[in-house]
């Protein structure tokens, strides 16, 4: 399954049906009055959030969507049938923007939300509406309303409580696999994670959602590497878990690289609560661990937690701390 989180599509409401020109015809009634019915209303275009979806791949290849037109009016004052509305399902976390991205029309944050973005066109009036004392046999009717059409931009931001950040190969995917049932691709080389991965963490009969975002590199906010494409997915989370590769020769530089990218991308990310973890401590001596923690704490003025996703050392503490932070923000 391809992970698609940005698409542009064309949508159009259904046109209203035309009104009918008709006159009553019945045996022994030579000149019946007007009995043209109204046209049916066109179908609307409606978006609906669906928790079964997690990508916009359904809109990658088909990009034009039109609701059904209303039927024309009929004789005997029969109205045309209304057109069926077009319901388009999207994942929770989808945002609907104008084509240029400057106007946010709607933001889906829970399951089964609906948003009518285009109303169907009104049906035209049949000639029976235009009968008057001076015109007993009107041939006037109105045409159905032409429905609105537009190009829109759909953008998916994954909904998670916790976002995992760090340089490539910091151990984020391993962390996710240890604390959840998610099975991300894991290998000992950069950019193993090519798409965001989500997992559910269960702690003491409670749960939260955690997202593993592809590794950041210097210049990610400018489009370098993979990070720029996926940074938006952690804008909604409550807390960031920042993993640093303890085997790195310069853990402070690694930390600063990621922080710069977060701060350059948006104020939302800049101000997120951050839990800093020194990972891969299983390959370090106690003295090396303490030395690197001291360096990080001097720069960050925050507590730094030593962990190992290989031995699970310290991981459970981080998970419980994340849950506590989430609950304190609710």
Curated annotation (Swiss-Prot):
The keyword Hydrolase applies. GO terms for molecular function: GTP binding; GTPase activity; magnesium ion binding. One of its GO terms (cellular component) is cytoplasm. Pfam families: GTP1_OBG, MMR_HSR1. Residues 1-159 form the Obg domain. Keywords: Cytoplasm, GTP-binding, Hydrolase, Magnesium, Metal-binding, Nucleotide-binding. InterPro entries: G_OBG (IPR031167), GTP-bd (IPR006073), GTP-bd_Obg/CgtA (IPR014100), GTP1-OBG_CS (IPR006074), GTP1_OBG_dom (IPR006169), GTP1_OBG_dom_sf (IPR036726), OBG_GTPase (IPR045086), P-loop_NTPase (IPR027417). The keyword Zinc-finger does not apply. Residues 160-327 form the OBG-type G domain. Its cofactor is Mg(2+). It is found in: Cytoplasm. Its EC number is 3.6.5.-. GTP binds at residues 166-173, 191-195, 212-215, 279-282, 308-310. Mg(2+) binds at residues 173, 193. GO terms for biological process: ribosome biogenesis. HAMAP family: GTPase_Obg (MF_01454). Monomer. Belongs to the TRAFAC class OBG-HflX-like GTPase superfamily. OBG GTPase family. An essential GTPase which binds GTP, GDP and possibly (p)ppGpp with moderate affinity, with high nucleotide exchange rates and a fairly low GTP hydrolysis rate. Plays a role in control of the cell cycle, stress response, ribosome biogenesis and in those bacteria that undergo differentiation, in morphogenesis control. This is GTPase Obg. The gene is obg.
């Amino acid at each position: 399954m391809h992970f698609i989180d940005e698409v542009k599509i064309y949508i159009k409401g259904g046109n209203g049906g035309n009104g009918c020109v008709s006159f009553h015809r019945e045996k022994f009634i030579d000149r019946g009055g007007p009995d043209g019915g109204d046209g049916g209303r066109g179908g609307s275009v409606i978006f609906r959030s669906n928790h079964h979806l997690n990508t916009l791949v359904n809109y990658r290849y088909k990009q034009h969507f039109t609701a059904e037109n209303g039927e024309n009016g009929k004789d005997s004052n029969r109205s045309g049938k209304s057109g069926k509305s077009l319901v388009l399902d999207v994942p929770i976390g989808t945002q609907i923007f104008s084509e240029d991205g400057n106007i946010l029309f709607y933001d889906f944050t829970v399951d089964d939300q609906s948003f009518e973005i285009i109303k169907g066109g009104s049906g035209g009036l049949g000639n029976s509406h235009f009968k008057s004392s001076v015109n007993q046999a009107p041939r006037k009717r109105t045409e159905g309303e032409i429905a609105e059409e537009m190009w829109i931009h759909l953008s998916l931001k994954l909904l998670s409580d916790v976002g995992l950040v760090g340089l490539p190969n910091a151990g984020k995917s391993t962390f996710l696999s240890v604390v959840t049932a998610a099975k991300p691709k894991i290998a000992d080389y950069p950019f193993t994670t090519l798409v965001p991965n989500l997992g559910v963490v269960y702690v003491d009969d409670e749960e939260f959602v955690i997202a593993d975002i592809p590794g950041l590199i210097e210049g990610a906010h400018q489009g370098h590497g993979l990070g720029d494409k996926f940074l938006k997915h952690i804008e909604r989370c409550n807390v960031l878990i920042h993993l640093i590769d303890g085997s790195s020769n310069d853990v402070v530089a690694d930390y600063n690289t990621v922080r710069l990218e977060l701060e350059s991308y948006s104020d939302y990310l800049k101000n997120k609560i951050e839990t800093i973890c020194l990972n891969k401590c299983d390959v370090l001596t106690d003295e090396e661990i303490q030395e690197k923690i001291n360096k990080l704490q001097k720069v960050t003025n925050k507590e730094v937690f030593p962990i190992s996703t290989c031995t699970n050392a310290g991981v459970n503490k981080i998970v419980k701390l994340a849950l506590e932070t989430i609950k304190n923000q609710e």
